[in-house]
Amino acid sequence: MGQKSSKVHITKTDRAILEVKRSKDEIHKFTRRTDNLILVEKSQLKDLIRKNPENYKSNMKVRFLLKRIHYQEHLLQQASDQLINLENMVSTLEFKMVEKQFINGLKNGNEILKKLNKEFSNVDELMDDVQDQIAYQNEINETLSRSLVGTSNYEDDLDKELDALESELNPEKMNNAKVANMPSTEGLPSLPQGEQTEQKEREEFATEERSDTKEPLALLS
């Protein structure tokens, strides 16, 4: 009589753990791809700012691309948070009590991954045909408005971020702006003649002191 092999019983918890592992692998894959996509889009954003130095903040493509980058970052964070939530459910001793929540959470996680996958399709078309992407733009705006509770004006924050990028690309322009904003001395009263003479004497004395301290150093060399 041969010994019968014992049949391995796979529990619902085992299946849930397997699903979480699959989700984790998918999220890691999409994270790498999305990070690379965001780097490319940030480079495109800088190019657009260079090409539109005067009206980059009012340029529809510029604003749309920056919002899209924020949207992608938000999706990645959502996917990561959802995965942590699922892992916590699986680790509970009473998995049956949260099984329904787990299944719903898994569905939500898959929906997020579908949205991330959509970001890789027709990237150039989305950039070149912004006017025809009304539904997509609305989805981005609604998602960001829900995720940025407490932010008084998201559009103002976009302006500040674009200004920071423009300053990074054109530091000389920013320095010139700082100089232009310095208070002017025009119209201020001149120093009285006696004070001008004293100031001149102090400057000459300081110059002589500097030259005196340099002479011993020259002798030592």
UniProtKB/Swiss-Prot annotation:
Source species: Saccharomyces cerevisiae (strain ATCC 204508 / S288c) (Baker's yeast)
Name of the gene this protein is made from: VPS20
Protein's recorded name: Vacuolar protein sorting-associated protein 20
Stated role: Class E VPS protein implicated in concentration and sorting of cargo proteins of the multivesicular body (MVB) for incorporation into intralumenal vesicles. The lumenal sequestrated membrane proteins will be targeted into the vacuole after fusion of the endosome with the vacuole. Acts a component of the ESCRT-III complex, which appears to be critical for late steps in MVB sorting, such as membrane invagination and final cargo sorting and recruitment of late-acting components of the sorting machinery.
Source taxon at top rank: Eukaryota
Region feature (Disordered): 170-221
Keywords noted in UniProt: Coiled coil, Endosome, Lipoprotein, Membrane, Myristate, Protein transport, Transport, Vacuole
Primary residence: membrane
Subunit structure: Core component of the ESCRT-III complex (endosomal sorting required for transport complex III). ESCRT-III appears to be sequentially assembled as a flat lattice on the endosome membrane and forms a transient 450 kDa complex that contains DID4, oligomerized SNF7, VPS20 and VPS24. SNF7 oligomerization into a membrane-associated filament is nucleated by association of SNF7 with VPS20; the process is terminated through association of VPS24, possibly by capping the SNF7 filament. VPS24 subsequently associates with DID4/VPS2. Interacts with the VPS4.
